[in-house]
UniProtKB/Swiss-Prot annotation:
Gene: rplR
Pfam families: Ribosomal_L18p
GO terms assigned for molecular function: 5S rRNA binding; structural constituent of ribosome
GO biological process, any: translation
Disulfide bridge partners, by residue number: none
Name this protein carries in UniProt: Large ribosomal subunit protein uL18
GO CC, one annotated term: cytosolic large ribosomal subunit
């Protein structure tokens, strides 16, 4: 594994331990060069309460690896989380920089009604 990925995974592990200590529901985000994924995971870490990604049929028709797609995923995850009764979450960016697609997803989720 290269050094850049090891550093990202180390940051992600540290963040997840901190969120687990808080005992709150988390919005976990993962990205690949082509897609972006978001999950709302229960406080005990055992259940996915809502999920959205660029693989969803409603979002798949457009481009999937850009900021516009991440914004749509953010709005969709906020809508689905609110439908599941979740309004307050901790943002787990999986060690990725808070920039670009990650930031766009987070901003759209906030506008959709999720509190970080």
């Amino acid at each position: 594994m290269n050094e850049k990925k090891q550093s990202r995974l180390r940051r992600a592990k540290s963040t997840r331990l901190h969120i687990r200590a808080l005992g709150v529901t988390r919005l976990c985000v993962n990205r690949t060069p082509r897609h972006i994924y978001a999950q709302v995971i229960s406080a005990d870490g055992g259940k996915v309460l809502a999920q959205a990604s660029t693989l969803d049929a409603s979002l798949r028709s457009g481009t999937t690896g850009n900021i516009e797609a991440a914004t749509k995923v953010g709005a969709l995850i906020a809508e689905r989380a609110k439908a599941a009764g979740v309004t307050k979450v901790a943002f787990d960016r999986s060690g990725f920089k808070y920039h670009g697609r990650i930031k766009a997803l987070a901003d759209a989720a906030r506008e959709g009604g999720l509190e970080f």
